Amino acid sequence: MKKVLLVLAAICCIAAVDASAAKKKAKHVVMIGIDGWAAEGIRKAPASDIPNIRYLMENGSWTLAKRSVMPSASSINWTSMFNGLPTEMHGFDKWNSTSGTIPSTSDNGHGIPPTIFTILRQQRPAVEMGCVYDWDIIGAISDTLAMDYHYFIKTYRGKETMITNDEYTKLATDYIKEKKPDFFTFYYGSLDNAGHQYGWYSPEYMECQKSIDRGIGLIIQALKDAGIFEDTIIIISADHGGKDKGHGGFTMLELETPFIVYGKKVKGGFEFPEPMMQYDTAATIAYIFGLDIPDDWRGKPMKQIFK
């Protein structure tokens, strides 16, 4: 009888693993986060300046109308992107926030709400997960304690470039080729800096967008070199746009940002018409991995973009 029970238990475990795997859309997800990347930046750029972004759009699913939460500032919106909550629920309401002005509706035990990194680690303990960023606040709001690898490096100081986007991107490509991560987030802060220093849609801003596109091409090649490209979903997202030399207001130039998804089981050439909010990003990543989401998350996955 004990042998029968053990066999049944083993079958149940295998079935549970198979069911979990069946829910996944891809084994690997790479999210490229671009700070200050306005939808208008894509509209204004010649296709020849952003060939990799255009390729992912033409062969993936996308919108240029993802809406930022208010106010349209970086920390507030990356927080929503990571933890599936609007401003009034996560409580991060000021520029450069690393904690909430009011208590969040939930806590991961590390002083912030559960993020996509938190729940992926809880539900898939064996995953390889990393994040590289050039703005230190990303480390404070993402839950680095859930990651295998996280690395911060400053790439700019005002108008001074300390490390080029091409050099910075090598940190991402090296990690991808060495570790073949299940989930990897790579954050570019240089475009937001270009907007503040020279103005959104200025020649310098557009040139920076062009250099980030080159970086995206290098990341795509690294995924191929690592042998995981065919089982990867690439997401490109942004926190806010901009106007003149700033953001934080309530104009559509500041609030509308791109969201591009390409890869395994993703529809090609599909501009989806449904509304999308910043906090839907976390829910969409959770859906790709087949994860259960926290009860208080308000984000919903963009299921319509998948085959």
Predicted regions and their residues:
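Sec-dependent N-terminal signal peptides
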Residues: 4-13
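…; additionally, a secondary subgroup of soluble metalloenzymes is captured
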Residues: 8-9, 18-57, 128, 179, ...
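Active-site nucleophile/metal-coordination loop of metallo-enzymes that catalyze phosphate/sulfate
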Residues: 23-26, 39-122
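Beta-strand elements within well-structured catalytic alpha/beta cores of enzymes
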Residues: 26-39, 56, 81, 120, ...
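Metal-dependent active-site segment of extracytoplasmic phospho-/sulfohydrolases and closely related
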Residues: 31, 52, 208-252, 285
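Substrate-binding rim/cap in mid-to-C-terminal beta-strand-loop elements of soluble/periplasmic
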Residues: 82, 250-292, 303
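Catalytic-site neighborhoods of secreted/periplasmic enzymes
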Residues: 89-163
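Active-site His/acidic residue clusters
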Residues: 139-153, 170-214, 218
